[in-house]
Amino acid sequence: MRSWSAPKVPRLPGVGAPLRLFDTAAGEVGPTQPGPTARLYVCGITPYDATHLGHANTYLAFDLVNRLWRDAGHEVHFTQNATDVDDPLLERAEQTGQDWRELAEREIELFRTDMEALRILPPREYVGVTEVIDQVAELIELLRDKGATYDLDGDLYFDVAAAPKFGAVSGYSEERMLDLFGQRGGDPDRAGKKHPLDWLLWRAERPGEPSWPSPFGQGRPGWHIECTAIALANLGSGFDVAGGGSDLIFPHHECGAHEGHVACGEWPFAKAYVHAGMVALDGEKMSKSKGNLVFVSRLRKEADPMAIRLALLAHHYRSDWEWTADQLASAEVRLARWRSAVGLPAGPEAETVLAELRARMTDDLDAPGALAVVDAWADRALAGGGTDPGAPALVRDIVDALLGVEL
C-alpha cells in the first residue's frame, strides 16, 4: 500500500540530544537508545470513518519522535499499518450498504490527505492487513507450533498461560484487564475458553464475512496478531518504540508484546511502549463509536493545517484534554505572530532558541515548553529587538524541523 508524500525537513546546525520518552512498561521517562537506524512502529487506523483530532494527536506525537531522532543523527525506519479488515469496518459497510473494500480504500485515501496536510512524515512501509494475510497466518502457525494456541469451534486462540510476563506492558491488575478486554474487542465471557483473557488469533469463516485460506481453514486474523506480524516482518524483534494512543495499552499492545515474545523468544518485543493521551469533546473521549468527532478533513477547510498542528502541540502528548474551538483560534493568532516574526529582516539571535527547543523536545516531547520558547523569541523580534539578519530564517527552519510547523 502506498504511503503519502514526505514534506522537506530542513537540516539544522549541530546534532540534537538523545531523546527521552515515557515508557509505559517501565512507568518512567528514560532514554531511547537506538542504533544508527531507529525503529518505530505506530498502530494505524481502522478505516471506517474519517481521521479525527484524536488520531491526529497520536500521529503528531510520533511524528515528533521521528523528527527528533532524525535531528539526533539517526536514520528512522518507521512502519505503520492500516487495519483494512475488522469488525467495525464490516459493520459500517453493512449499515451503509457499501462494499467494505471501497469504504476502506476511500477512508485510507482521506487519511493520507490529512497526514500530508498536517505534515506528518510518512512511514517507510504503510501496510494494509489484507496485503499480508499470509504473513499473519505464518506467525500464527509458529505460535501454534510452540504450543501457545488452542482451537475453539474452529477459532484459534492465544493461551495466556503461554505468556509468563503477561501484564508487564500495562501493569494492570487482572480485574482491570478483564474490564478493558470486554470493552475493547475481547470476549472474556465466551464459553469454552481456557482463560477469560485468552485472545483471538484467527476467526473462522462466518457467513457474509470476508475470509482467506490458511493452515487453520478459511477465516481472517484477529486484531492484535496483525500488528505483531507487520512489525516483525519489517522491523524485527526488539525495535525501539511501539506507539499508539493510550487506549491501546491494553489489550492491544499487551497482547502483541507476548505474541512477539513467544514467537521470537526475546523480551522485550519493543524496547519502549509509548502512548499519547486521549482527546475529548463534550466531556467524552473522541471516538468513532461515540460519534463525538471533530474531523481533520473538515477542520482544515476552515483553518490553516499549521494552526491545527499548533493547537495540538499546545498540549503535552501524554495528557488527556478536551478540544474547544477557542484553542484553534489561539493557535491561529500564534501562527500569525510567528510568521510575522520570521518575516522580519533581522531578529534576536536564534542559537539559543535551537538549544532550548532541543532541550525541551528531547525531554519527553515537551511541546508546550517549546512553543513558549518560540513565543518569547517572536515577542522580542516583533518589539524590534535583535539585529541578527540570519535569525528569522534559522527560527523558521527550527520550527519546521523540530515541530513540523511550516511558517
Swiss-Prot record:
Signal sequence range = none
How does this polypeptide assemble, per the annotation? Answer: Monomer.
Q: Which GO terms describe its cellular component?
A: cytosol
Q: What does this protein do?
A: Catalyzes the ATP-dependent condensation of GlcN-Ins and L-cysteine to form L-Cys-GlcN-Ins.
Q: Which residues bind Zn(2+)?
A: C43, C227, H252
Looking up Pfam families in the UniProt record yields: tRNA-synt_1e (PF01406)
* Placement of sequence motif 'ERGGDP' region: 183-188
Q: Which organism is it from?
A: Streptosporangium roseum (strain ATCC 12428 / DSM 43021 / JCM 3005 / KCTC 9067 / NCIMB 10171 / NRRL 2505 / NI 9100)
EC number(s) given by UniProt: 6.3.1.13
Name of the molecule in the record: L-cysteine:1D-myo-inositol 2-amino-2-deoxy-alpha-D-glucopyranoside ligase
Concerning Gene3D superfamilies, the annotation shows: Anticodon-binding domain of a subclass of class I aminoacyl-tRNA synthetases (1.20.120.640), HUPs (3.40.50.620)
What family does the database annotate? Belongs to the class-I aminoacyl-tRNA synthetase family. MshC subfamily.
Motif position, 'HIGH' region:
45-55
So which domain of life are we looking at? Bacteria
GO biological process: any one? mycothiol biosynthetic process
Keyword annotations of the record = ATP-binding, Ligase, Metal-binding, Nucleotide-binding, Zinc
Query: What binding details are noted for the cofactor?
Result: Binds 1 zinc ion per subunit.
A molecular function GO annotation: zinc ion binding
Q: Which reaction does it catalyse?
A: 1D-myo-inositol 2-amino-2-deoxy-alpha-D-glucopyranoside + L-cysteine + ATP = 1D-myo-inositol 2-(L-cysteinylamino)-2-deoxy-alpha-D-glucopyranoside + AMP + diphosphate + H(+)
**SUPFAM superfamilies, from UniProt?**
Nucleotidylyl transferase (SSF52374)
Q: Which cofactor does it need?
A: Zn(2+)
